[in-house]
Regions:
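Feature for exported/extracytoplasmic and membrane-associated proteins, marking the mature portion
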Residues: 2-314, 335, 349-353, 358-424
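Short glycine-biased active-site loop of nucleotidyltransferases that positions the nucleotide triphosphate
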Residues: 133-134, 338-344
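Metal-dependent active-site segment of extracytoplasmic phospho-/sulfohydrolases and closely related
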Residues: 308, 312-339
């Protein structure tokens, strides 16, 4: 019997064979500190109109949702988790959410936002994908389709094309954080990119000469360079230069997470900046030495929590119009494995935060953790479709029609209704 809980309260890592393969998301562009592929001029908006921002964060490698948001009151939880279980009492106790679910102790910023009703959790969630390949799982998560296969566009890019124009939103295209455009943002809509600077910045004179050359010899490359220079000017205007633009660790390093979050927040907060963005953090494939309240996963979750704080600080001027969603390709096994970690699973969690979020809630149609309740006898069984969450956000936060969501953005999802009550 499922327990319905909707509370209202105050790329692959080492050890996974896919890590050695070349990513399908190869570099699509290069530059100095910025990567850009297209450019869209800003659209004037009516004074006083709502100006929403949406940021999608992808945790690559498969987040262990049973550790991030442990169901501490499920009678089967502690025995299944063994050494990686999160305790409800003690020095490193889980942070309370609603009496049934709790939060990993490394996520203090998220816990505060939850208490302030600016953050929520959706548990036992997954895409339609039921296999356990990182690449296929991430492709399905980002493409928005109901099955894996060759695709050339992502659902967030298609959402940009369907976004209403005029007074409700001022859009300047999408923003990708990192050295390549993620699949979720690929497509016909305009996209620009930013990444921490890894080589010395080119001088203005060199940039001008290259632009003149490309505009005469290769107009398409000239457009891309012009877009990159435009984004560079925006980054400089927002103070993302010098030491702030130097890499502070990889995408799986807490410092790298925080730096990427700071860059995304500053660019999204700019009055003439983009309104929709995506970034990803690697390293969540915790097959071995995962740890419980402390250890490898705790370090990653602490970095993610630091990124949440950076979002809140950097987006402060527009925080009330901001929604952030954090997702992963699939979950991990319910049982601890023989190397004190967890293996590829199915159901997991998604996080929502921001001033536009109707927070203080855990959305969960809880399936239970007894063996007969697990998916294939090993995984948390998903009872919610990630597409329902995406649809609810895009409909209620960005004003995209249900018809466009079902037909263009998430084809084949007519049976998946957008989730209600996610935003204010």
């Amino acid at each position: 019997m499922m327990k319905t809980v909707t509370s209202d309260a105050a790329f692959a890592a080492p050890g996974c064979h896919e890590a050695s393969q070349i990513s399908r998301r190869g570099l699509l562009g290069a530059g100095v500190s910025l990567y850009a592929w297209a450019h869209m001029g800003k659209v004037a908006r009516a004074t006083g109109a709502k100006d929403p921002r949406l940021l999608v964060v992808i945790l690559r490698g498969a987040l262990d949702g049973l550790s991030a948001v442990p169901p501490i009151s499920d009678p089967a939880y502690a025995a299944l988790r063994g050494e990686i279980a999160i305790a409800s009492e003690g020095t490193f106790a889980a942070l309370p959410l609603d009496g049934f679910f709790a939060l990993h102790p490394a996520m203090k910023t998220f816990a505060r936002l939850y208490r302030e009703k600016k953050a929520s959790v959706i548990h036992a969630v997954a895409t339609p994908y039921r296999e356990r390949s990182h690449f296929d799982g991430q492709d399905l998560l980002e493409s928005g389709y109901d099955r894996a296969g060759r695709v050339d566009s992502g659902w967030l890019n298609r959402a940009l094309l369907a976004m209403p124009r005029g007074e409700r939103i001022n859009t300047r295209g999408g923003l990708g954080i990192g050295p390549a455009t993620p699949l979720i943002l690929r497509g016909e809509a305009a996209v620009m990119g930013w990444a921490p600077q890894t080589v010395p910045q080119a001088g203005d004179d060199l940039a001008a000469r290259l632009l003149d050359l490309y505009q005469h010899r290769d107009p398409e490359l000239g457009k891309a360079l012009l877009a990159g220079l435009d984004t560079d000017r925006l980054a400089k205007a927002e103070g993302i230069t010098g030491d702030k633009a130097k890499p502070q660790g990889g995408a799986a390093d807490p410092r790298g997470m925080i730096q990427a979050a700071q860059g995304a927040a500053r660019l999204l907060a700019a009055s003439d900046g983009p309104r929709v963005a995506a970034l990803s953090f690697d390293g969540w494939d915790t097959h071995a030495n995962q740890g419980g309240a402390t250890g490898r996963l705790a370090t990653l979750l602490g970095g993610l929590d630091g990124a949440f704080a950076a979002f809140e600080e950097g987006l402060k001027p527009v925080w009330n119009d901001t929604a952030v969603i954090v997702v992963t390709e699939f979950g991990r096994t319910a049982r601890v494995n023989g190397t004190v970690g967890s293996d590829h699973g199915t159901g997991t969690v998604a996080f929502l935060l921001g001033g536009a979020i109707a927070g203080g809630k855990v959305f969960a149609d809880w399936p239970g953790l007894r063996e007969k309740e697990l998916h294939e006898g090993r995984d948390l069984r998903p009872t919610a479709d990630l597409r329902a969450i995406f649809k609810g956000l895009l409909r209620d936060h960005l004003g995209i029609s249900s018809a466009a969501l079902a037909e263009k953005i998430f084809p084949g999802s007519q049976h998946v209704a957008g989730m209600n009550g996610l935003v204010t």
